[in-house]
Amino acid sequence: MPKQRRAELLLILTTGFWSVSYYFTRVCFTELDALTLNAFRFLLAFFLLAPVYRKHLRGMTRETRKWGGVVGAVLVLVYVGATYGVKYTSLSNAGFISCLAVIITPLIELVVFRKRPEKKLAAALLLCTVGLALLTLGDGTSFAVGDAICLLCSVSYGADIVITDRAVAKPEVDPIAMSVVEIGVTGAIFLALAFLFEQPRLPRSPQIWGAALFLGLFCSGLAFVVQTTQQKHTAPARVALIFTLEPLFSAVVAYFLAGERLHPRAYLGAALMLFSLVLMQLDFGRKRYDDVRQGV
């Protein structure tokens, strides 16, 4: 099998892992609190990745450690939003709303760095706003709490992307080592928060053990390894389009595994949001969306 085809199939599989993560996160809530679950997940991923990339870690610079710590702290905000968002909204909504960082990122760059976005951003934002309203407002005129939390998660993702983009552009920063440090810092912060605000405990039932291990091994650890080793074998635009499939996969998982059924209006909204993501990715975020799931 050609390297490009194999790489793209593995990246599609990785996207599937991320899509299923929303469902398994909700399953884990029956026995684990949110902070404890994230600590378990990220520390497991760190201890999986550290031996794989030990050569990178041995030779990493001070700048690499510094930026790994900064991005790891920001990633905590991302996953606080993602985890609690899943808890208080539908899996389908969480999947679509949490992926909006690809559109939010250029807005952050415009505000913070005065970097002019592409002209099609306005069209993408309009489509996305209409789609978000159709998806989330239902029969009322306000967001559910979980929808708002997921939107805050997307904003945090946007900040994570911008910071990561600036960090890896520095010649003294090793992106792989930085990402492993990032995951370790995220796990350590979540563990500290869990001891402060929760009563950390390990899963009790085999079902929850399986779900938690899947999140750590496949959705965080293995997914990162696949992304960093395989995306170089295909075009960045194709990688971005593959990752745009995540909200669609999330909706399919929610339909078949969780039995979620959306109003036809919500499906129209989801389609508009998906189209806005594709519009942005056709020749836009070569780095944007590649970075949005870095280490997740």
Language model features with spans:
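Transmembrane alpha-helical segments that form core, pore/gating elements
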Residues: 46-49, 105-106, 142-200, 212, ...
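Membrane-interface helix-cap regions at the ends of transmembrane helices
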Residues: 20, 24-27, 31, 44-61, ...
